[in-house]
Regions:
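FIC/Doc superfamily catalytic core
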Residues: 1-109
Length: 109
């Protein structure tokens, strides 16, 4: 059985985009704005594109989206709203690359 290979390289989110997403989450739901640790943010944003021996550690778009969610939530770079931001970043990455989550608000929560 052959594996399905993406025809194009996904578009990844840059730090400025993620900071805007975080700001929107804080404005909408409340919390303390700001970055607690820039290094943790940079590390989390590098994970979806991480390689080992020229092989992607997260080779599929779904694994890359999961990497955004996991690393932003588990290594919290922001003062507040880390899990909310992680979910919103994952959703933005998927949308940027032509995918949509099919979840109710209750399922997403």
């Amino acid at each position: 059985m052959r594996s399905i290979v993406a025809l194009q390289t996904p578009e990844f989110l840059d730090q400025a985009s993620v900071l805007r997403i975080h700001d929107r989450q804080i404005c909408k739901y409340g919390g303390t704005p700001g970055v607690r640790a820039v290094g943790l943010l940079e590390s989390a944003l590098a994970q979806p594109q991480a390689t080992l021996g020229r092989e992607l550690l997260h080779p599929t778009i779904h694994q890359q989206a999961g990497a955004y969610l996991y690393y932003l939530a588990m290594n919290p770079p922001f003062l507040d709203g880390n899990k909310r931001t992680a979910f919103a970043v994952m959703d933005a990455f998927l949308r940027l690359n032509g995918y949509r989550l099919n979840l109710s608000n209750d399922q997403a929560y």
